[in-house]
Amino acid sequence: MGYFEIDVEDYYFPEQKESRQAALEGEYDVKCNYLGEIPYSEARNKSEVNQAIARDIASHEKYILCGVTINWSDEILSTIQKVFWLKVNSAERVRRVKRREEKRWGERVLAGGDMYEQQDSFRNLIGGFSEQKVLDSLSDFKGEIVELDGTLPISTNMQIVKEKLEQIN
């Protein structure tokens, strides 16, 4: 459809983009040069992330910004036309992330592994995201909010997304 993907994680942790893309394609042995000894241990700050995202938005007429909330600068928010909110309960969200990270990092994210504490903290963080937190982040958004059921097949939700994006063009 010609949209440029802006995944927020890639901006906080730019060195992991190749690894994330490979994982989406089912490849889990891609090696990256991380900023710290442990992947995801050294992040850019929010100001740097906002600037980098704003630059990429300015460079791409059509983009999809992927992330948990939309607490962005007015410059970024003013360009967003639709929000797709993939709704899934916290327990399922944590289960999916845990499964994905175990596939991606193996024993490193299990108890005793060098990434265990970091990933455990991350799972606790995402498990604590409430629907209210997302609603609060959307409070100033003026565009359409499209709710997607995260328990439905990916193909079903993708069809909804495709139809909504076609309305923009």
Where are the language model's segments positioned?
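Conserved substrate/cofactor phosphate-moiety recognition/catalytic segment
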Residues: 1-51
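Short, structured coil segments at secondary-structure junctions
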Residues: 1, 79-80, 141
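Small-molecule kinase domains that catalyze NTP-dependent phosphoryl transfer to phosphate-bearing small molecules
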Residues: 105-160
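Conserved phosphate-donor/acceptor-positioning beta-strand/loop module used by diverse small-molecule
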Residues: 79-100
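Structural alpha-helical scaffold elements that stabilize or flank donor/cofactor-binding regions
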Residues: 56-57, 76
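Conserved beta-strand scaffold positions in the cores of enzyme catalytic domains, especially
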Residues: 3-7, 83-85, 145-147
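Loop/turn-to-beta-strand initiation segments
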Residues: 59-63
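Short, well-ordered alpha-helical microsegments
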Residues: 71-74
